[in-house]
A protein has these predicted regions:
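Conserved C-terminal guanine-recognition region of P-loop GTPase G domains, centered on the G4
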Residues: 99, 104-165
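Glycine-rich nucleotide/cofactor/substrate-binding loop typically near the N-terminus or early
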Residues: 168
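P-loop NTPase switch module centered on the Walker A-proximal segment
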Residues: 1-109, 115, 149, 158, ...
């Protein structure tokens, strides 16, 4: 890994309800950026971020994990410290600690489940820390999932500042 100055480092936190797909998104980003050559699976117990024995047994994140990603931006290389946080609020202390150092947030939303409590809490935390954020929608391939309905619900709940910039 290269050496980066502070102006080239970004801390990005993954937030959302438990089971929304934060760790899967982290795995995909790690693979796309070349951190790993394969995507781990939670059910197989071989993800980069959920490596603790208890996390593997329970099949969900208990602690925040840092995944260093390197990205070639328009102004040169940058390092993104991706913070994969627990979604279950028994572990909210982990989320509070991680969000306090974040520069931006990705709120992961399960399209079928819609706006769950974890999504609302994630938004509230981003408001509290004045963090720029975006929604990343997962599970759109389910027959009972509607991307358009979810976008309307997000606009209704969080205001007109919600705007899709990538359509499925």
């Amino acid at each position: 890994m290269n050496v980066y100055g502070t102006s080239q480092i970004r801390n990005v936190i993954l937030l959302g309800h438990g089971g929304a797909g934060k760790t899967t998104v982290a795995e995909a980003l790690a693979m796309i950026t070349g951190v790993t050559k394969r995507m781990g699976k939670i059910t197989d117990g071989n993800t980069i971020s959920d490596y603790d024995k208890e996390e593997i047994k329970r099949q969900f994140s208990i602690s925040t994990s840092l995944i260093p990603l390197e990205y070639e931006g328009e102004n040169g290389p940058i390092k993104i410290n991706l913070l994969d946080t627990p979604g279950y609020f028994d572990f909210v202390g982990e989320v509070e600690e991680a969000i306090s150092v974040a520069d931006a947030a990705i709120i992961v939303v399960n399209c079928k489940a819609g706006i769950e409590v974890g999504v609302e809490k994630a938004w509230e935390m981003c408001e509290k820390y004045n963090l720029p954020r975006l929604f990343f929608v997962t599970n759109m391939d389910d027959d009972h999932a509607s991307y358009r309905e979810l976008v309307l619900k997000l606009e209704t709940r969080f205001g007109r500042k919600i705007a899709p910039f990538q359509l499925p």
